[in-house]
């Protein structure tokens, strides 16, 4: 969003959040360029999804004014895609997001791949992106791996929180990560080196 947040510190990198673009399976949209003239949700205003969508569009060379953008959270976007009221939606979240899995169970969907060139541009221009593969079978009906980019979900704390408490918190998270993973369905990727 371009805003600077002060009085916070990064504690640990938790898990990758994949940049995902969902379309109906019967759609003629195969690439980012095919979004031209389409109704596309880029995420809620000032959300991480919106920021990622804008960066992806910028690096793809497709001017955003050539797309009929909507600002929907991904629950509303999934409902509107199923109803045929939008053509695609961007969202950034851990792979196998429940909302998309539920959508896939009653509406045939596809995820768009980001080609090598676009992923290279993104990771060069914005070093917080990494290449990411959403494995086949992550969502119902997904028959192939999807190549995209991801950002890391970061645990932050107030600068006022003392280091001893931060250390205790991270130790607890690392000790109970299997339970956290089960409770959240998120692919936590914690290790001692991810603590910041």
Predicted regions and their residues:
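A structural signal for short loop-to-beta-strand junctions that line the ligand-binding cleft
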Residues: 4-14, 138-146
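Bilobed "Venus flytrap"/periplasmic-binding protein-like clamshell domains
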Residues: 16-83
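Short, solvent-exposed amphipathic alpha-helical segments in soluble enzyme
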Residues: 57-59, 105-106, 171-175
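Segments of small-molecule ligand-sensing domains
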Residues: 138-196
């Amino acid at each position: 969003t371009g805003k600077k947040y002060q009085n916070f510190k990064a504690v640990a990198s938790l898990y990758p959040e994949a940049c995902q673009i969902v379309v109906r399976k019967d759609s003629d949209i195969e690439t980012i360029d095919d979004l031209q003239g389409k109704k596309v949700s880029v995420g809620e205003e000032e959300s991480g999804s919106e920021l990622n969508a804008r960066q992806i569009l910028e690096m793809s060379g497709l001017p955003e004014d050539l797309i009929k953008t909507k600002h929907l959270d991904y629950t509303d976007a999934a409902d509107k895609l199923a109803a045929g009221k939008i053509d695609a939606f961007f969202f950034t979240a851990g792979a196998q997001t429940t909302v998309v899995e539920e959508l896939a169970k009653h509406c045939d969907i596809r995820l768009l791949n980001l080609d090598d060139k676009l992923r290279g541009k993104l990771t060069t221009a914005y070093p917080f992106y990494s290449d990411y593969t959403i494995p086949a079978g992550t969502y119902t009906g997904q028959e192939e791996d999807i190549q995209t980019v991801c950002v890391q979900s970061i645990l932050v704390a107030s600068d006022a929180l003392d280091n001893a408490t931060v250390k205790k918190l991270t130790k607890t998270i690392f000790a109970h990560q299997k339970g956290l993973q089960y409770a959240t369905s998120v692919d936590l990727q914690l290790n001692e080196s991810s603590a910041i």
